[in-house]
Amino acid sequence: MVGVKPTYGVVSRYGVVAFGSSLDQVGPFARSVEDAALAMNALVRGGSDHMDCTSQSIATDFTANLEEGVKGMRIGIVPTFMEAEGLDAEVKERIEEAGRKLEAAGAELVEGELPNAQAAMSAYYVLGPCEAFSNLARFDSVRYGYCVEGCKDLNEQYELSRAGGFGVEARRRIMLGSYLLSSGVYDKYYYPAQQVRTLITQDYMYAYHKVDCILAPVSPRTAFKFGEINDPTSMYLSDMFTISINIAGNGGMSVPVGLGVASGLPIGAQLIAPAFRDENMLRVAAELERCYGKAPIAPAFAKAGE
């Protein structure tokens, strides 16, 4: 499975129920890089959407350079990601192997640094819940959202409808956002998180002076089965390599680079593009797909589907 998260503003968010307005982005899942690129062409349609003020006018054919290979491209390897605590040795080896394959195909591997990337998770779990609290407040069961019938009064309707309409994680983030935006707390957490966001965005801008695309893990471990992990902290840590690009607004995508030996489940390489140069990551992804072949269905899922 190939997944694409475009640069913020490339695809219109019109029609999307907002969770975090500065973080939400629409992108495709596909069985191949070419399919993902074709889906991107359909989503973008060559222009901005007047229904979304963040939408940019992009006139790019995302399939145009899929066959060009990576010769002459500079691929960034970031020690902050590759030496991160908690990164599974098997995942690390697969990403390093992917780098070697790209180098053999003519790319140049360049070591880069994102000095503030380690602070991305802390900043995200301030900014995300704050935006979620603001956006989801409209779902009051009267004007918008799920409504429990037969309540004795309006307060009970609000309480039961919001409790029943939102899942556990959504409620957790709404409550956290409410606290973080409260008087006396806002200046202590929200404002510094925005400053960290600016620093991370600048880090990526500086990094792309030297590279055309960054190669990194998607997750610190192989894919896990649905329901296997219930601890919220462990779930949050599974996003440790993808959060910084959401904060910065850069495009990123996942492309399979093999299956875990023990689990038989996929390992993904993350490709991170400069802002509004999403075609770069698709070009590199197409080369990796040629190296590894199109992703097979994981045996565990193939068996379940028989």
Model-predicted segments: where are they?
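Glycine-rich, small-residue loops and helix-cap segments
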Residues: K101, E108-L109, A119-M121, G128-S134, ...
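A glycine- and small-aliphatic-rich helix-loop capping segment at beta-alpha/alpha-beta transitions
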Residues: M1-G3, P232-T233
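Short acidic loop-to-helix transition motifs that present clustered carboxylates
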Residues: I58, A117-A119
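Short, solvent-exposed loop/turn segments at secondary-structure boundaries
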Residues: G86-E90, A123, E228-N230
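A short beta-strand-loop structural module common to alpha/beta enzyme folds
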Residues: E111-P115
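N-terminal G-site helix/loop of the GST-like fold
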Residues: D88, E103-A104
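A short helix-breaking turn/cap at a secondary-structure junction
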Residues: V2-E93, E97-A98, C151-L160, R290-E306
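Conserved catalytic core of Hanks-type protein kinase domains
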Residues: A42, V126-L127
